[in-house]
Curated annotation (Swiss-Prot):
UniProt name for this protein: Oxaloacetate tautomerase YisK
Organism whose genome encodes this protein: Bacillus subtilis (strain 168)
CC per GO annotation: cytoplasm
Name of encoding gene: yisK
Cofactor(s) in the UniProt record: Mg(2+); Mn(2+)
Family: Belongs to the FAH family.
Single GO BP term: oxaloacetate metabolic process
UniProt remark on cofactor binding: Requires a divalent metal cation for activity.
Functional description taken from the UniProt entry: Tautomerase that converts enol-oxaloacetate to the keto form of oxaloacetate. Also shows weak oxaloacetate decarboxylase (ODx), catalyzing the decarboxylation of oxaloacetate (OAA) to pyruvate and CO(2).
Subunit-level organization: Homodimer.
Length: 301
């Protein structure tokens, strides 16, 4: 099941992708098919409803397969809908994991940079932007804008002191994040927040895939292309700290809540890792692909 936040005719809605070609407006479908109005207006609110929401969405998808003269009132072609980030306005900072792939840690320094414990930082919620949106170049403050293709985990059930064994019970699903970074600001300020939190530097999407559709997230492949050139190619199995380990570590003294976003780290091949570095410039297009989530595409303005 692939969920999305769509916009059509200046109206935002929670959508369910059907056959990778159509998108169902869940609120309108519920009203037409069941004469109910129980589905919240934002995906983050839907996530908080947990299994109840997922079961209801699955039921609506099954009903929509039946002959219905009013199908056009809640089912649209995906090509006519603007996809925003699945969670356009997170309620808190995006949790990010640094140097979680051995080769990336080495390209950023040396083997001494391979962490013994998860390196955790955050990005401001105002950084979030969607698939197809323009990313600001921020040329007035940085000359070292860099890309980082990442698998992101979205929490579905709140919890504290979550064990590795129970971690996946607290996951709602998976999406793609581009953790765009101003390397010079990151170095100058000796702390990641400013270099990671420029406006529009957290493209997310294009959809949020429910965990039931991804049985083995550790097998997911991450590929990043810049202007068509393959720059990053890695597997989630190469993470130093697995998704369950990250959830266990983060939740030991901090409550993880439904809708929280964890960007799990990037493989090697970032711009800074090349000699000379290949930083982003105005006009560059970045495509990050993780099947079956899809491809997150953005261009530098």
């Amino acid at each position: 099941m692939k969920f999305a936040t769509g916009e059509l005719y200046n109206r935002m809605f929670v959508g369910l992708i059907i056959d990778d070609e159509k998108i169902m407006d869940l609120q309108k479908a519920e009203k037409k098919l069941f004469e109910l109005e129980t589905i919240p207006g934002s995906l983050i609110e839907c996530i908080a409803e947990g299994d109840k929401f997922v079961a209801h969405a699955r039921q609506l998808a099954e009903w929509a397969k039946k002959p219905n003269d009013e199908l056009g009132s809640f089912m649209y072609s995906l090509s006519e809908v603007k996809l925003h980030a699945p969670i356009p306005k997170p309620s808190k900072n995006i949790i990010c994991i640094g140097k979680n792939y051995r080769d990336h840690a080495i390209e950023m320094g040396s083997e001494a940079d391979i962490p013994e414990h998860p390196m955790v930082f955050t990005k401001s919620p105002v950084t979030v932007t969607g698939h197809g949106d323009i990313v600001k170049s921020h040329e007035e403050v940085t000359s070292q804008l860099d890309y980082e293709g990442e698998l992101a985990v979205v929490i579905g059930k709140s919890g504290t002191r979550i064990s590795k064994e129970d971690a996946y019970d607290h996951v709602f699903g998976y999406t793609i994040v581009n953790d765009i970074t101003a390397r010079d600001l990151q170095k100058r300020h000796k702390q990641f927040f400013i270099g990671k939190s420029l406006d529009t530097t957290c493209p997310m999407g294009p959809v949020l895939v429910h965990k039931s559709s991804i049985q083995e997230p550790e097998r997911l492949k991450v590929e990043t292309r810049v202007n068509g050139e393959l720059r990053q190619s890695g597997s989630a199995s190469d993470m130093i700290f697995s998704i369950p380990e990250l959830i266990e570590t983060l939740s030991k003294g901090m409550t993880l809540e439904a809708g929280d976003i964890i960007a799990t780290g990037t493989p090697s091949g970032v711009g800074k890792g090349f000699t000379p570095p290949k930083f982003l410039r105005s006009g560059d297009k970045i495509d990050i692909t993780i099947d079956p989530i899809g491809t997150l595409s953005n261009q530098i303005g």
